Amino acid sequence: MPLLHPQSLRHPSFEIQTQRRSNSTTRLLLSHKFLHSQASIISISRTRILKRVSQNLSVAKAASAQASSSVGESVAQTSEKDVLKALSQIIDPDFGTDIVSCGFVKDLGINEALGEVSFRLELTTPACPVKDMFENKANEVVAALPWVKKVNVTMSAQPAKPIFAGQLPFGLSRISNIIAVSSCKGGVGKSTVAVNLAYTLAGMGARVGIFDADVYGPSLPTMVNPESRILEMNPEKKTIIPTEYMGVKLVSFGFAGQGRAIMRGPMVSGVINQLLTTTEWGELDYLVIDMPPGTGDIQLTLCQVAPLTAAVIVTTPQKLAFIDVAKGVRMFSKLKVPCVAVVENMCHFDADGKRYYPFGKGSGSEVVKQFGIPHLFDLPIRPTLSASGDSGTPEVVSDPLSDVARTFQDLGVCVVQQCAKIRQQVSTAVTYDKYLKAIRVKVPNSDEEFLLHPATVRRNDRSAQSVDEWTGEQKVLYGDVAEDIEPEDIRPMGNYAVSITWPDGFSQIAPYDQLEEIERLVDVPPLSPVEV
């Protein structure tokens, strides 16, 4: 039987059915593609929706985190303000300003979760006499905040650095304060005061050095007894390595070996300059210079080479000592070095329940009165004080609880406070107003300003050239001063006075305290624009 060709099997009805099936299959295929495309669209839309939702959630989370962060920062800022406000209640007695405004508060950290506050108080000197008060008060005021549970206070001091560090020799570039101890007369106990003051400052926590500037008669090798009594040289740096005793660095011509007994002035000045400027002093808070007696080349060299912060004047009750001291004070005033304290040595002794003044009294108080020096300290005739100078151990070290040691403690506090004030001083407070023809006075640490008549200021000079220092008799009479006199120059003298130069060449030292007591001008014409 012959095989039939497939086409022969086609029947119209079959073709129709096949076509129907084909159309149906096509429709099914189309429907499937449509559904698949719709599913893809739905899937894409769903993905986009999920992505959009995810983005929105991320934005929401970021916004929430930012809001939380802002709230956290706001709370932290509020907490920091609370702490600083509490600390601003503490006033520095020297500057008259709170410790926050002084810039003492450093490294403030707050942990709110634990209620813990940490900060550092950076004072101007490690020998600050009120550092314990600052620490206790800071703990107290911060702990009083309701959310604070623990307070951590760290005390520190500013790095040792002089005001004009860039203009100094390398050896002096890291010394904060240089104190001159001077008498301008030998044999009054100047070296004793210098050494005991230095070791008092060291006992208060300061880094201290002593420079014995007396080449002809050095006292330091006798008054202290270091293990190494010879100064060594650093061969690489060509600098002098100071010797040391009980933490205080020491330099003296007496430690330089056997030198010449006779030297001319220029040679001595060169030796002093070399010893002072090429020594590796390192970082010091205070360098105490034991000045040689007199007011000559050596003193001028020291004042020119070393930027003296302040001077301490040593005297005895005799009139002769007072005369030399007056010369020294005037020398320092011309060199713009403020004298911050007077030490009257060998002023009295106690015996049989009585106090005796074998050399009289009043010399130290006269210096304070005439020159406006703010502080006076008395030292008695005490055998142990002189004996300690011969034994090599200062009195303040061998007997720190003695009356003499307490006096030196008061002197040390005075020096620290006065040096801090001097370093904060910016400009003069006294000027001459040519339009009003009056001296305008603005006292430091005060908003008060007043005017003085120049002739009145000149007539109120209390120096030995105007007033006899013993009888009080006025040497310059009222008519000796012209009514229309005008000052030629007014310059500051440290933080306690000004130097006024008059047309006759006289240089008047006018302490601020004295200027405040002088009769003031009341009927002053109002200021008006001056035509140029």
UniProtKB/Swiss-Prot annotation:
<dbReference type="InterPro" id="IPR010376">
    <property type="entry name" value="GBBH-like_N"/>
</dbReference>
<dbReference type="Pfam" id="PF06155">
    <property type="entry name" value="GBBH-like_N"/>
</dbReference>
<keyword id="KW-0547">Nucleotide-binding</keyword>
<dbReference type="InterPro" id="IPR027417">
    <property type="entry name" value="P-loop_NTPase"/>
</dbReference>
<dbReference type="GO" id="GO:0005524">
    <property type="term" value="F:ATP binding"/>
</dbReference>
<keyword id="KW-0067">ATP-binding</keyword>
<feature type="binding site">
    <location>
        <begin position="184"/>
        <end position="191"/>
    </location>
    <ligand>
        <name>ATP</name>
    </ligand>
</feature>
<feature type="modified residue" description="N-acetylalanine">
    <location>
        <position position="62"/>
    </location>
</feature>
<keyword id="KW-0934">Plastid</keyword>
<dbReference type="InterPro" id="IPR019591">
    <property type="entry name" value="Mrp/NBP35_ATP-bd"/>
</dbReference>
<dbReference type="GO" id="GO:0009507">
    <property type="term" value="C:chloroplast"/>
</dbReference>
<dbReference type="InterPro" id="IPR044304">
    <property type="entry name" value="NUBPL-like"/>
</dbReference>
<dbReference type="Pfam" id="PF01883">
    <property type="entry name" value="FeS_assembly_P"/>
</dbReference>
<keyword id="KW-0809">Transit peptide</keyword>
<keyword id="KW-0408">Iron</keyword>
<dbReference type="InterPro" id="IPR033756">
    <property type="entry name" value="YlxH/NBP35"/>
</dbReference>
<dbReference type="GO" id="GO:0009570">
    <property type="term" value="C:chloroplast stroma"/>
</dbReference>
<comment type="function">
    <text>Required for photosystem I (PSI) biosynthesis and assembly. May serve as a chloroplast scaffold protein that specifically assembles iron-sulfur (4Fe-4S) clusters and transfers them to the chloroplast PSI and ferredoxin-thioredoxin (FTR) complexes. Can assemble a 4Fe-4S cluster and transfer it to apoproteins in yeast cells. Probably not required for assembly or stability of plastidic 2Fe-2S clusters.</text>
</comment>
<dbReference type="GO" id="GO:0016226">
    <property type="term" value="P:iron-sulfur cluster assembly"/>
</dbReference>
<dbReference type="InterPro" id="IPR002744">
    <property type="entry name" value="MIP18-like"/>
</dbReference>
<comment type="similarity">
    <text>Belongs to the Mrp/NBP35 ATP-binding proteins family.</text>
</comment>
<dbReference type="GO" id="GO:0046872">
    <property type="term" value="F:metal ion binding"/>
</dbReference>
<keyword id="KW-0150">Chloroplast</keyword>
<dbReference type="InterPro" id="IPR000808">
    <property type="entry name" value="Mrp-like_CS"/>
</dbReference>
<keyword id="KW-0479">Metal-binding</keyword>
<keyword id="KW-0411">Iron-sulfur</keyword>
<dbReference type="InterPro" id="IPR034904">
    <property type="entry name" value="FSCA_dom_sf"/>
</dbReference>
<dbReference type="Pfam" id="PF10609">
    <property type="entry name" value="ParA"/>
</dbReference>
<dbReference type="GO" id="GO:0005829">
    <property type="term" value="C:cytosol"/>
</dbReference>
<keyword id="KW-0007">Acetylation</keyword>
<dbReference type="GO" id="GO:0051536">
    <property type="term" value="F:iron-sulfur cluster binding"/>
</dbReference>
<protein>
    <recommendedName>
        <fullName>Fe-S cluster assembly factor HCF101, chloroplastic</fullName>
    </recommendedName>
</protein>
<dbReference type="InterPro" id="IPR038492">
    <property type="entry name" value="GBBH-like_N_sf"/>
</dbReference>
<feature type="transit peptide" description="Chloroplast">
    <location>
        <begin position="1"/>
        <end position="61"/>
    </location>
</feature>
<dbReference type="GO" id="GO:0140663">
    <property type="term" value="F:ATP-dependent FeS chaperone activity"/>
</dbReference>
